[in-house]
Amino acid sequence: MLSRLFRMHGLFVASHPWEVIVGTVTLTICMMSMNMFTGNNKICGWNYECPKFEEDVLSSDIIILTITRCIAILYIYFQFQNLRQLGSKYILGIAGLFTIFSSFVFSTVVIHFLDKELTGLNEALPFFLLLIDLSRASALAKFALSSNSQDEVRENIARGMAILGPTFTLDALVECLVIGVGTMSGVRQLEIMCCFGCMSVLANYFVFMTFFPACVSLVLELSRESREGRPIWQLSHFARVLEEEENKPNPVTQRVKMIMSLGLVLVHAHSRWIADPSPQNSTAEQSKVSLGLAEDVSKRIEPSVSLWQFYLSKMISMDIEQVITLSLALLLAVKYIFFEQAETESTLSLKNPITSPVVTPKKAQDNCCRREPLLVRRNQKLSSVEEDPGVNQDRKVEVIKPLVAEAETSGRATFVLGASAASPPLALGAQEPGIELPSEPRPNEECLQILESAEKGAKFLSDAEIIQLVNAKHIPAYKLETLMETHERGVSIRRQLLSAKLAEPSSLQYLPYRDYNYSLVMGACCENVIGYMPIPVGVAGPLCLDGKEYQVPMATTEGCLVASTNRGCRAISLGGGASSRVLADGMSRGPVVRLPRACDSAEVKSWLETPEGFAVVKEAFDSTSRFARLQKLHVTLAGRNLYIRLQSKTGDAMGMNMISKGTEKALLKLQEFFPELQILAVSGNYCTDKKPAAINWIEGRGKTVVCEAVIPAKVVREVLKTTTEAMVDVNINKNLVGSAMAGSIGGYNAHAANIVTAIYIACGQDAAQNVGSSNCITLMEASGPTNEDLYISCTMPSIEIGTVGGGTNLLPQQACLQMLGVQGACKDNPGENARQLARIVCGTVMAGELSLMAALAAGHLVRSHMVHNRSKINLQDLQGTCTKKAA
């Protein structure tokens, strides 16, 4: 029950960070302000003379107070030093934020408690620093930092609060009750110290439950790398935190704490209300007396300076004990910042390192369709291959063995030959100096201790030991990348696990996996990764479209496709270029809901088609994204099932995730008006996505684009090697009549899917969406003064495409998008990059249609494919597309 309440509290705080932060700061300032305006206007040393204060200061034990301050500073220093060993600047920053704001809240409470006299902070702050505990704060931060998205951040913070909240609450209660016993001792100084201690515990608890989780959520949201769509703070080293923190505290310890709490409550009740029902002085009054605030020992004086100057002079003036304390703090700060950097880096190299964020150059601000001059960084090199003269000489089949990682100083990325069958297995992490791995695997218990150790980690385990832990179910195979020190080693170990289960262990030898930036793949593109598939990428162009020239990348294994498209681009360019327009832009999602009766469904349909109903659904839908804007609803029913097709703009993203989120919110809003409505599925195939559907052909989906060009008769004869009359005749009887006879939906073209799929693979699109995106009707007719010129147009109503998210985050795909000048989001005009890419797709399809139809009209198709699409290589002697083996 308590865990559920704390979970709800954590989710609320993480979901509304601005409101919680502003509310907390406002409450803190109000506490100070109310005291400043309503408190005592007698300030010692400024307008009142307090002789007892001087006496108390002289009689106090300065040595003990100085030692206490120094111990407190050392304690905080060691806490931050331990946090630094985790290797995360975010952990350090968030913990520092927690400390600073906690001290601010505590100072406010002390000022309010002591009636705006700042002198009490000298004694209070050491107790605050000694009682502050960053372990809980860092544990909650680890929960958040192990997330892959902002939604997961909120969920993990809520989960962390559910686990840590009850324990921290009980600990704070016990600490307050234990320390509070000292307030009943009768010793004035001890009572004041214990009062400060209780206030410190309460201030820490207040900040941990409100301000801190809100700040964690906000900081991580603001630190997202928006261009890549991936968080730069995701820490692979903390991926196990959910499992580690899931273990509940010892129930025996919790029961003992509760019994102690009840006993201490009885002690406090007896001492305060039974044994001494009318205490003479409260702790606050005694503290004021101790600080010289009692009226009977003060006399009024005329202030010589303003109040702010008085406080400033008090802060600047320093006694010998303050000089010692400040000197120690400065020395430790200098040591921590400057002299521990090398030591920390050395220590972190022996741990699970944090995945480095992807470094990308800034984009130009003057043009939304921008190009980046440099894409690949030193540590993000794409795979390259080198010719090895020894490969063709030695053709024996080699079994995959663990790899030795290349030295970091190597400037070349190559596929490395695998170890021979007689070679001993070597771990990827075993190349670090000072790390010696045993030749035989150690016991699972010892390996688990090393893996979970903050000082060691997976780098101190061999591949054989990791495989042993996976086989024993101690490590899930799908988490190998997050648990290893590098993603690549996780992929390598998974390949070894898989090879042992295959009938042919050498099956993966030509599937590369080295030197690939897997940080962009994890959590976004693929799971259970065993490598990547190199596909040849050709270029067709220049394509002259709307007054600009484009070199179009095409990833394909079909011979003649790029050459044919390139010929079509040349014909279009010689004819003066093509023109294009985007007719519509809107992604769709079609959920299916059910009501008790068909008449009820009809009533909901009628309500949705009214302006009021549409406005309600649109408000809920639009609230889920700054880009998603509901455009229209298309509603139909089948019996008591209701199908609602929501169509919305999605910016530069393809938009399926965005519109699905908005659809879900809209359906929940619809349920508020019709409680009997049952949501069957957020996708009811009425969208329609990745399936042939007439609704996409008629209504459109994604981008609807039309492209046209006029090819002069001379170009038709000399470049396309045919005549306008022949091309028009073939187009009518093939693309129109032939497709109609076949009952085609949207297939009134020669081979639009060829070009669409090739561009989609090259540019990181969802290749399965070529089903709807390839809908195209190609029209040709004679034109010009003598009817010898060729007019051609392609209309594509459902190009589902985007330039951000998914595969567009991968570096090779980004390179292809940059070739076209449409990589990333367009800041000046959101959605323009995606629309421009759709135009390029349609223009390239038209070029492909032009060339293929010309080949068919001239009878050249079979001959060209026999020349360009039939390999003459003896496949029996083929070593593989990669000149070196992958493992």
UniProtKB/Swiss-Prot annotation:
Molecular function GO labels: coenzyme A binding; GTPase regulator activity; hydroxymethylglutaryl-CoA reductase (NADPH) activity; identical protein binding; NADPH binding; protein phosphatase 2A binding
Active-site annotation: 558, 690, 766, 865
Lumenal compartment residues: 40-56, 115-123, 188-191, 276-314
Domain of life: Eukaryota
Motif mapping: INSIG-binding motif: 75-78
Entry annotated with the keyword tRNA processing: no
Cytoplasmic-facing ranges: 1-9, 79-89, 150-159, 221-248, 340-887
Gene3D superfamilies in alphabetical order: 3-hydroxy-3-methylglutaryl-coenzyme A Reductase, Chain A, domain 2 (3.90.770.10), HMGR, N-terminal domain (1.10.3270.10), Hydroxymethylglutaryl-CoA reductase, class I/II, NAD/NADP-binding domain (3.30.70.420)
Pathway it works in: Metabolic intermediate biosynthesis; (R)-mevalonate biosynthesis; (R)-mevalonate from acetyl-CoA: step 3/3
Alphabetized UniProt keyword annotations: Cholesterol biosynthesis, Cholesterol metabolism, Endoplasmic reticulum, Glycoprotein, Isopeptide bond, Lipid biosynthesis, Lipid metabolism, Membrane, NADP, Oxidoreductase, Peroxisome, Phosphoprotein, Steroid biosynthesis, Steroid metabolism, Sterol biosynthesis, Sterol metabolism, Transmembrane, Transmembrane helix, Ubl conjugation
Family membership noted in the UniProt record: Belongs to the HMG-CoA reductase family.
UniProt name for this protein: 3-hydroxy-3-methylglutaryl-coenzyme A reductase
Source organism (scientific name): Rattus norvegicus (Rat)
